[in-house]
Amino acid sequence: MINIEKKDKIDIVSFSVAKINAMISDEIRDGINKVFDNSNSKVIIDLKGVEYIDSSGFGCFLSVMKTARNSYGILKFANPEPRVTDLLELLHLNTIFQIYSDMDSCLKSFN
């Protein structure tokens, strides 16, 4: 469900599910929060292939953002699908999260 790989000292989190909802949001939150156990972690959440996120999924990401800030980490998002982009904009979460349309630009933003 959740995959974490490291690239140039940046943890990249991806998902093997197309929907992030109440059924799995706690597991996702806990998995991503473990990455922030180390202070100053840099994390990208790769949303490629995620077609839908419900309110509990967005709540999960807001919780992870708080954890990141508390551990002096950085959290960014990459590759949102069009429907997810629409939801992020509708909920004005694009003003809270750093979101990049592709992985390369997201990785470069850390330099």
PLM feature spans:
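Thr-Gly-centered strand-to-loop micro-motif
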Residues: S14-F15, A22
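Acidic phosphotransfer microenvironment of two-component signaling modules
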Residues: P82, D104-S105
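Short acidic-hydrophobic, aromatic-tinged amphipathic segments that line or gate anion-handling sites
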Residues: Q98-D102
